[in-house]
C-alpha cells in the first residue's frame, strides 16, 4: 500500500537551506504531520513508513491515480487557496485487475523507454538504501557500547570508587552478597578440614607401610640411616686413626640394644651432641675413615640394653655435646611408637598458626572481591543508564535513517519465499517464547541480577520467566495476524502448517 503526496506550490521548499521549511504537509489518512518535508519539488511516495521520491519516467509516476485535494482543518491557517496540498491516495478499481495494467505498462516501458537509465537509477537508489541501513545499524549498536565503555572506565568508576571507599563503611552492597561471602568461606573451611584429614591419613599410612626399621643406627628426618657401631650386640674393633686423643668409656651389654627409629622428634632444633659416631663423615664396617678431630668428651655408660639404661641414654644424649656434629632432628621411639607429647603439641601449635594465617588470607581475599563487586554493580547501573539515554537520543535524531533501515529490512524480508519467511519467524518465536526458552530466560535474569547487584530470588526469576514470554507470545501473534496476514497470507498459511 502506497500513499503519495504532491506539492502544487514548490516555493515552500528552500533548496539552499533544506533544514528550513515553511509548509508542513500531511501524509496518510490520519493526517500525521511530518517534522520537515523532504527538500524536493518532485512527487514522493510513502512505503512502510518511509518517504521516497518518485523518479521521472518510472512506473509509479506514470500510473493513473486519483487526486483528492484536502486541507487540514487543524492547520488551515498555514495555507491559502493557492497553497493546497494534493494527496494521491489509491488507484480506482476498474473492470480489470490493477496487476494487468501494471504488467502492460512495464512491458511498454521496456520497449519504448530508456531502460538503461531507469535500471541505473534503481540500482543507485537501492545502493543508497543499503549503505544507509548499514550505517544506521552500526551507529545504533556501537555508539551506546562505546559510551558505556568510556563512561564506565573513565567517569563513573573512579567517582564510585572514591565515594564507596572513603565515605561508605560497608563492604557488601546488600545482605545477599554477604551471605554469598559467608557460604564461600564455609566451603573453604570444609576444604581445609578435608585436606588436613587426608594429610594425616597419608602420614599414618606412610609409617605403617614403611620398611622394617634397621637396628644399630640413627634415622634422620629425610630418611637417611646412619649406622652406629656402638649399638651392636657385640663390640667392633675401632680403628686407632678414627679419633685423636679421645678417652671413650662405653659399656655395652649383650641384651638387645637401644634402637633409634624414625617417628619421634626428640630435638626441636639443631643441637651439638657429644656423640662422635654421629659425625657425617664417619665410616664404618671396616671401611676407611677419614681423620676427624673432636674436642674432649667424656662418655660413661651412654647406652644400655635395659629400660633404665635407655632412659639414661636419652638424658645423656641431650646433655652431652659434640664439636662439629650437626644433627638434624634425631628421632627416638616412644613407648607406643608415636611422638612425644611435648613435640606433638609444638607441631600442632605451628599447624594451627599456619591454618589461621590461611583463613586470614582467604577472608581478606573475599572482602576485597566483594568490595570490588559492589563498586562494579553501582558502576554498571549508571553506565548503562547513560547508554540508554544515548540510545534514545539516537532514535530521535536518526528518525529518517531508521525509517529507511526499516523499509529496507522489510523489503528484504518480503523478498524471501514463503517457506523461508515461515522458518525465520518460527526460529525467532521458538527462541524467545518456545518450550525450551525458559532456561534461556533464567540465565538472562540471573545475569541481570548479578550485573546490577540485585538480590537474587528464585521466586522472582520464576515469576518473570512465567509472565514475560507469555506477553511476547501474545505480541508475536498480534503482529502475525494484524500485519503479516495482510501483506503475505501465504506466509501465514505456511507458518501455521509448519506449527501443526
Curated annotation (Swiss-Prot):
Primary location class: plastid
Spans annotated as Insert: 204-354
Query: What GO CC annotations are associated with the protein?
Result: chloroplast inner membrane
Catalyzed reactions: K(+)(in) + H(+)(out) = K(+)(out) + H(+)(in)
Q: What keywords would UniProt list here? A: Antiport, Chloroplast, Hydrogen ion transport, Ion transport, Membrane, Plastid, Plastid inner membrane, Potassium, Potassium transport, Transmembrane, Transmembrane helix, Transport
Task: Show the stretches that span the lipid bilayer.
Answer: 129-149, 378-398, 425-445, 461-481
Q: Note the topology in the membrane.
A: Multi-pass membrane protein
Q: Name one GO biological process term.
A: potassium ion transport
Q: Which residues form the signal peptide?
A: none
Q: Name one GO molecular function term.
A: antiporter activity
Q: Which Pfam families match?
A: CemA
Q: Where in the cell is it found?
A: Plastid, Chloroplast inner membrane
Main function: Contributes to K(+)/H(+) antiport activity by supporting proton efflux to control proton extrusion and homeostasis in chloroplasts in a light-dependent manner to modulate photosynthesis. Prevents excessive induction of non-photochemical quenching (NPQ) under continuous-light conditions. Indirectly promotes efficient inorganic carbon uptake into chloroplasts.
Q: What is the similarity comment for this entry?
A: Belongs to the CemA family.
Q: Which PANTHER family does its entry note?
A: CHLOROPLAST ENVELOPE MEMBRANE PROTEIN, CHLOROPLAST ENVELOPE MEMBRANE PROTEIN-RELATED
Would you tell me the protein name for this molecule?
A: Potassium/proton antiporter CemA
Amino acid at each position: 500500500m502506497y500513499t503519495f503526496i504532491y506539492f502544487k506550490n514548490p516555493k515552500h521548499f528552500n533548496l539552499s537551506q533544506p533544514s528550513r521549511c515553511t509548509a508542513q504537509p500531511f501524509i496518510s489518512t490520519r493526517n500525521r504531520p511530518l517534522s520537515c518535508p523532504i527538500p524536493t519539488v518532485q512527487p514522493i511516495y510513502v512505503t512502510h513508513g518511509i518517504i521516497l521520491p518518485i523518479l521521472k519516467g518510472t512506473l509509479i509516476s506514470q500510473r493513473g491515480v486519483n487526486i483528492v485535494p484536502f486541507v487540514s482543518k487543524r492547520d488551515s491557517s498555514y495555507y491559502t487557496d493557492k497553497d493546497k496540498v494534493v494527496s494521491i491516495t489509491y488507484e480506482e478499481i476498474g473492470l480489470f485487475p490493477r496487476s494487468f495494467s501494471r504488467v502492460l505498462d512495464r512491458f511498454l516501458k521496456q520497449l519504448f523507454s530508456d531502460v538503461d537509465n531507469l535500471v541505473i537509477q534503481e540500482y543507485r537508489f537501492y545502493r543508497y538504501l543499503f549503505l544507509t541501513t548499514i550505517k544506521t545499524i552500526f551507529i545504533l549498536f556501537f555508539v551506546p557500547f562505546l559510551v558505556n565503555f568510556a563512561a564506565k572506565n573513565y567517569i563513573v568508576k573512579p567517582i564510585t570508587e572514591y565515594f564507596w571507599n572513603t565515605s561508605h563503611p560497608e563492604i557488601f552492597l546488600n545482605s545477599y552478597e554477604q551471605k554469598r561471602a559467608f557460604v564461600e568461606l564455609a566451603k573453604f573451611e570444609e576444604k581445609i578440614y578435608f585436606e588436613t584429614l587426608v594429610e594425616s591419613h597419608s602420614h599414618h599410612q606412610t609409617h605403617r607401610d614403611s620398611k622394617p626399621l634397621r637396628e644399630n643406627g640413627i634415622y634422620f628426618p629425610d630418611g637417611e640411616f646412619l649406622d652406629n657401631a656402638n649399638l651392636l650386640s657385640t663390640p667392633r674393633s675401632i680403628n686407632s686413626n678414627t679419633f685423636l686423643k679421645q678417652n671413650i668409656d662405653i659399656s655395652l651389654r649383650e641384651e638387645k640394644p637401644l634402637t633409634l627409629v624414625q617417628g619421634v622428634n626428640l630435638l626441636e632444633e639443631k643441637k651439638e651432641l657429644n656423640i662422635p659416631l654421629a659425625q657425617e663423615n664417619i665410616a664404618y664396617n671396616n671401611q676407611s675413615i677419614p681423620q676427624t678431630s673432636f674436642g674432649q668428651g667424656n662418655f660413661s655408660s651412654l647406652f644400655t640394653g635395659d629400660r633404665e639404661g635407655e632412659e639414661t641414654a636419652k638424658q645423656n644424649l641431650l646433655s652431652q655435646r659434640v664439636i662439629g656434629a650437626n644433627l638434624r632432628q634425631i628421632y627416638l621411639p616412644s613407648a607406643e611408637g608415636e611422638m612425644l607429647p611435648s613435640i606433638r603439641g609444638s607441631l600442632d601449635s605451628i599447624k594451627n598458626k599456619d591454618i589461621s594465617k590461611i583463613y586470614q588470607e582467604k577472608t581478606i581475599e573475599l572482602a576485597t572481591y566483594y568490595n570490588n563487586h559492589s563498586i562494579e554493580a553501582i558502576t554498571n547501573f549508571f553506565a548503562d543508564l547513560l547508554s540508554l539515554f544515548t540510545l534514545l537520543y539516537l532514535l530521535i535524531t536518526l528518525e529518517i535513517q531508521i525509517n529507511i533501515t526499516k523499509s529496507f529490512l522489510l523489503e528484504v524480508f518480503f523478498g524471501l519465499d514463503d517457506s523461508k519467511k515461515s522458518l525465520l519467524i518460527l526460529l525467532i518465536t521458538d527462541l524467545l517464547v518456545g518450550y525450551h526458552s525458559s532456561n534461556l530466560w533464567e540465565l538472562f535474569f540471573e545475569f541481570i541480577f548479578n550485573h546490577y547487584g540485585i538480590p537474587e530470588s528464585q521466586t522472582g526469576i520464576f515469576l518473570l520467566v512465567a509472565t514475560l514470554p507469555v506477553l511476547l507470545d501474545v505480541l508475536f501473534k498480534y503482529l502475525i495476524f494484524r500485519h503479516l496476514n495482510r501483506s503475505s497470507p501465504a506466509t501465514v498459511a505456511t507458518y501455521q502448517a509448519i506449527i501443526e
